[in-house]
C-alpha cells in the first residue's frame, strides 16, 4: 500500500506551465538558473503552444506503478492556475514535512537537481530515534544507471521551456525518484531534506510504502 504524503504546506514554487480553458498559465519559478532559467509544460500546454511531439510532462500528474516505483502523484494540474507545485531550494537549505505516523518499508522522494549534483542528507525521524542517510543526487541531465535500485526516473527525457514558454532544449531532462529504505519496525514521524551549497534542488512529491 502506498500513501501519498501531503507536502502542500512547504510548496513555494510553480515550475510547470499549465493549460485551462485555452488559457496558458506560465511557470513562475523554474527548474534551473536559480529558478529563473527554464520550466516544464504539461502536454496540453505544449501542444497549445505549437510544439510538435513535445517531450512534456503528462497532463495526468499521477505516475503509474512500474518495475521501479509505486504510484507517485505530483502537484501540478491543468485545472489549477494558482497554487504552488514544488518546493525549491538553492544554496545550503533544508525542508521538513510530517508524515502519517505509521510503519513504512520505504519512502520515495521525487527530486531534480540542476546546475550540477546536490549533496543531500535525508533525516528520517522516528518516534524513538533519528536516522540520517547521505545521498548525492545527480544533475537532472544525467543518465541513471539501471543497476542503481534506489534511484530511478519518474519522468524521463523531458524538454524544457524558457520564461516565455519557448522551448530551449528538446529532451534529455529528468525528474528522478529516490527510494529510501525505512525501518519497517518503527513508526516514522517526519522527513527532513538538508541540502549542501552546490546545486539547485526541486522537490516534487513524496510517498511512503507500507508492508
Q: How does the language model describe each region?
A:
Residues 1-211:
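N-terminal/edge-of-domain interface segments
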Amino acid at each position: 500500500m502506498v500513501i501519498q504524503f501531503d507536502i502542500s504546506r512547504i510548496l513555494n514554487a510553480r515550475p510547470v506551465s499549465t493549460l485551462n480553458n485555452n488559457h496558458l498559465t506560465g511557470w513562475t519559478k523554474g527548474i534551473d538558473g536559480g529558478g529563473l532559467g527554464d520550466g516544464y509544460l504539461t502536454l496540453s500546454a505544449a501542444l497549445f503552444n505549437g510544439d510538435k511531439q513535445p517531450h512534456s510532462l503528462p497532463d495526468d500528474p499521477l505516475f503509474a506503478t512500474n518495475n521501479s516505483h509505486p504510484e507517485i502523484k505530483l502537484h501540478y494540474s491543468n485545472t489549477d492556475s494558482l497554487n504552488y507545485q514544488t518546493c525549491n531550494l538553492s544554496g545550503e537549505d533544508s525542508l521538513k514535512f510530517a508524515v502519517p505516523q505509521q510503519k513504512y518499508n520505504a519512502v520515495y522522494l521525487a527530486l531534480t537537481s540542476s546546475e550540477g549534483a546536490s549533496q543531500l542528507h535525508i533525516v528520517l525521524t522516528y518516534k524513538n530515534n533519528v536516522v540520517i542517510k547521505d545521498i548525492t543526487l545527480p544533475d537532472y541531465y544525467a543518465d541513471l544507471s539501471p543497476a542503481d535500485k534506489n534511484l530511478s526516473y519518474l519522468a524521463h527525457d523531458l524538454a524544457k521551456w524558457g520564461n516565455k514558454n519557448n522551448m530551449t532544449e528538446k529532451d534529455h531532462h529528468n525528474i528522478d525518484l529516490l527510494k529510501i529504505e525505512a525501518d519497517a519496525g518503527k513508526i516514522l514521524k517526519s522527513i527532513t531534506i538538508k541540502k549542501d551549497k552546490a546545486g539547485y534542488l526541486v522537490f516534487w512529491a513524496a510517498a511512503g510504502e507500507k508492508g
